[in-house]
Amino acid sequence: RCHEASTADNAASKMYAYDAGKAALEDFCRSRGWKVQISHSLHLGFYRITYMPDILAVRQDVGIVGGRILDRHNKITSGIYDEEGNRLYKGLHKEYSGGSTHRATLMQDCAAVDIRCMRLCEKMRPVFEEITGVPYIETGKMKLADVSGISCDEAGYGKLSMELGRAAREMGFLVVWDSRMTIKIN
């Protein structure tokens, strides 16, 4: 019982609803005083918020922002952790959205992000040094935390990541995962 204008057959036939959702997000962000750009994601009904100049400058409630780490096969190896320290989306190809809710592609609050792909607000930087034993220095185009002075295995990186996430939340900050922040390791 589908016809050409049916939303069951053609999701684009209700673009007015998706545009209204986008406008609602723009209004919400404007009411918070956040300078942002809202865009449709690849999946209609899901949106991308781009903070101007970046999330740490705009959102005073965010202490850490981090992204995904891909292996040589473009599969997620790490990036986002749940409360138990499990790495979410591990093994997913970078192009896979994570199912019907597309969580693997959406910015979201989380327990922790991987220390190898993170940025911190000013107030979290001394905590980084306290936990890791190395000073917080931003490096590269994405200005990620330089972890070259930290020598540990995968489990060690996970432990440090969880400690930083816990410390941020104890200080009242959010930890945000953004899949657009991506690095590749071999």
PLM region spans:
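Glycine-centered structural positions embedded in regular secondary structure
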Residues: 78-81, 95-99, 165
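Conserved donor NDP-sugar-binding/catalytic core segment of glycosyltransferases
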Residues: 53-87, 174, 181
